[in-house]
Amino acid sequence: MANKRMFSVDVVETDAFLDLPPKTQALYFHLGMRADDDGFVSSPRTIVRTIGCTTGDLKQLEAAGYVISFSSGVLVVTDWKVNNTLKSDRYRKTMFQNELALLKESASKRYILSDNGTISEPIRNQNGNQQEPQYSVVKDSVEK
């Protein structure tokens, strides 16, 4: 992890960001400082406790779209690539490759959840008005 991080005024000087409570804004900056080179934070709850915030502040950031939380406890700063540009010789891959695989980058360089990370059933099960053929395998129904 680097010792220097950047924050874009295109993100932190917007009305949406400035409407957040000051503690929530401070949490965003601290998460950005502790993120790895792909924007992932391994221990967000530790940061929340360290700076005197609450999980409510973290939930506000998530509801506002500034972070995405994963079931593993890791989170990613959605505007990471808007805020930070790294030279390729200094870049270190994140160790959270499973979580990174669930994301895609939007045209505006923001992380968003990709569609393949949200489909839990095959497409054929998604369409409720069509049924697959039913075949009976009972011994008496087999023709000889």
Question: Where in the sequence are the language-model features?
Answer:
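Long, low-complexity, charged/polar intrinsically disordered regions in eukaryotic proteins
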Residues: 1-10
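Basic side chains
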Residues: 4-5, 34, 81, 90-92
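Charged low-complexity intrinsically disordered patches
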Residues: 85-144
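Winged helix-turn-helix DNA-binding recognition segment
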Residues: 11-85
